[in-house]
């Protein structure tokens, strides 16, 4: 039998788990789970929604930035479903995940998932039961979430309701796995997707209710991916001004430029999605405006100096512990990250380190040799296992690794390479 695979994400920000019956197909058409009550009542109305024009309106004047940004993980963090967007296999043995073999002598039903291309779409199908008595349930993939760097999960529409599908794609293993937080040996199609779940994977969507735990939306309002207007604000006035008067000088009067924010507001913009999952919502999802204090939107999480934040989703909290950050009044996320470019190579980040540090100042430079200049981060920002994303295969738990943003000396990894 194929190895049983499970992915678990433990985070207060993760979507609440729905009721799951072991070895039964749970579909929203049968019975929706009861959502937990919100921790506090949010304001009925947030700030006026930005007047958006879409990324294509930025291209005529900002072609270089726009062309590069299309390939970044932020832009690709959600997409409409397509053959190019979905990374997993839909053919041969790679399209099937067998969870349990049926055992007729024990009346133990089997469970398997199959990924299919049919009727012009991409489908997840769960089949459960004993031979000759199987039951199947299929749903079409409508939205892809995740750039694929670590993996992808998939969503589907049922009327105006949005749900997560039970299988996700795990990039490190190049295989289908149970979706984040799903119990193994189940086929659950009824996990609701709430606005806060979407906020870090999409630019906008309009809920049909002020309840923070709704999953009813205006489907046509979904703007996938993190777009230009997520960080620069609505661009309608900016485009209108420059269309009417092409020679007008660039101005912050009609558009937001995070590079001109004070350091704390720059970091707040990133912290919206990179400061952990324990911050309580104070305002409706998608109402945060770049340049405003994040603490007025999300309640600050309690800080325990004795507890190290997990490397998953806590980049800002880890960075703020770093001597580099504490000793500089200007260092921000953009000091090292070019948000408009798809950068992954260690040499690119090491180049940023060398703007303030020298190779000679590193005590390991003589031991490691010249190549140290191209790879500061493996020693000072090593990959560490996360407890938020765990992959279980046939009894073995594999912790996905992510690069820590606590920049410091790690003696255990500072060895000759």
Predicted regions and their residues:
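Bacterial N-terminal signal peptides that target proteins for export
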Residues: 2-16
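Bacterial N-terminal signal peptides
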Residues: 14-26
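Primarily the internal scaffold of c-type cytochrome electron-transfer domains
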Residues: 32-45, 49, 56, 64-145, ...
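N-terminal nucleic-acid engagement/recognition segments and initiation subdomains in replication
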Residues: 150
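Extended acidic/polar, glycine-enriched regions
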Residues: 157-166, 170-199, 203-207
